[in-house]
Amino acid sequence: EISSTSELVFRLICRLGNFDDISREAAECIYTGMMTDTGGFTYNSNNREIYYIISQLLSKGIDKDEIYRNVFNTYSEGRLRLMGFVLYEKMQVFPEFNAALIWLTRAEQRRFRFSKGDTEGFVNLPLSIKKVRFSVFLREDTEKDMIKVSLRSTGTFPCNKVAADFFNGGGHLNASGGEFYGTMEEAINLFKQDLVRYEDQLLMKK
């Protein structure tokens, strides 16, 4: 399975015989896309060919450690305070389903001076809780009248199917996204419905 669009781009370039034309800057972009789409290579990344591709990108002179720092370790104070608020006030764990939910309203985002990208990775946070294997993040969009939905899972749980069935979306097995047009209360209720529907799969060991 292809880990990301960036990996697909790399494969296409190579298929066309243009690997030698990849610049360091282009290699950095491809690596960054692969890294972010796999959560720092923590999901959708068990195919050994991914690491061969990384070795080829390294041969172009990229500094993967610096890329990681620039993406994940350059947060604003507001983002960290928002993260603390989310974990303490806006996260609900459903141990009976091995699942968790995070949600944010527009008013809450304004309170912390939200900037685009400030919530990047928030959906992954509940997955660090023991036995939680499915996490959903609902965020009222600050530009459109809709709710952005991010879904993450571990193991074989198909969050892409949940995204397609409930949130007009799709994606990878363990990383998907979608949209919801309605109120936050309605979106939360829909999430709870999908827990019931997928209970058996959520409680599987793999």
Q: What do these predicted regions represent?
A:
Residues 1-53:
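Short alpha-helices
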Residues 38-166, 171-206:
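Hydrophobic helix-and-loop "lid/oligomerization" segment in the mid-to-C-terminal part
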